[in-house]
UniProtKB/Swiss-Prot annotation:
HAMAP family: PPase_C
Cystine crosslinks: none
Listed name of the protein: Probable manganese-dependent inorganic pyrophosphatase
GO terms, molecular function: inorganic diphosphate phosphatase activity; manganese ion binding
Enzyme Commission code: 3.6.1.1
Catalytic activity: diphosphate + H2O = 2 phosphate + H(+)
Cofactor(s) this protein requires: Mn(2+)
SMART domains: DHHA2
InterPro entries per record: DDH_dom, DHH_sf, DHHA2, DHHA2_dom_sf, Mn-dep_inorganic_PyrPase, Oligoribo/pAp-PDE_c-di-AMP_PDE
Cofactor note: Binds 2 manganese ions per subunit.
Amino acid sequence: MSKILVFGHQNPDTDAIGAAISFAYLQKELGKETEAVALGTPSEETQYALDYFNIEAPRVVTEAASETNQVMLVDHNEFQQSISDIAEVNILAVVDHHRIANFETADPLYYRAEPVGCTSTIIYKMFKENNVTIPAQIAGMMVSAIISDTLLFKSPTCTQEDIDAAHALADIAEINLEGYGLDLLKAGTNLSDKSAEVLLDLDAKSFPMNGKTVRVAQVNTVDLAEVLDRQAELEAAMAAENAANNYDLFVLIITNILDSDSELLAIGAEQAKIEAAFNVTLVNNRAFLPGVVSRKKQVVPQLTEVFN
């Protein structure tokens, strides 16, 4: 049997990388030959966690079929968010907390999706169900993923299960949850030295919506003005992305992690859908979205509804 590659989505966030590391470890403990890999380099936030817990970043891969015919997916299922040759390999398992879309397999598989705030919360439960001890380093990456995905429990996606798992994992990792959590989130807000193109690609996903393609990117900051001062540069980069990739709409969500509010910037032919989705009026391609922090729960469903 060939080695099984375990990976999260393109433009990986802390959960995509942390869940790959923890799920690969769990599967190895259960007797499978696995390797955690990534579909991109770690963000500064993720690298902070990797460095803190002294874990080497997973190997970056762009395709799988040349080295294996077996993969396991974490933190995603939609093919357009996955590895380039996903249709050429056998998907053995999926562990995810997102909607199911653009996904099919030729063979039966293990599929576990739960409406929680973070994939690592589900994997924590799987460790317990299988009576596998979680090493401190692995626990550190898992709690980092939960902190990241739930914005330290401020996101509407956060559930009591996420909170309970985070506290248990923090104890194993021997960290102060609040103090470490704030440091982790702030590590991901250093945006000033990044080009517009890099900013737009830090955490971006494409979504097919009734024959249209919508790209939704999100960046976290502690200073909205710092990002919005670069609006013209960002708009030019968004327009270029639309032209290069045939996106019908590019949406950038700029989230203030301290206030739990976001500013939306939208460019594209389907821009009018924004006003209907969020009951706002775009002014200079922008709208303020109070209380919006979650792409998964507060942006994508609303856009999907108006496109349908």
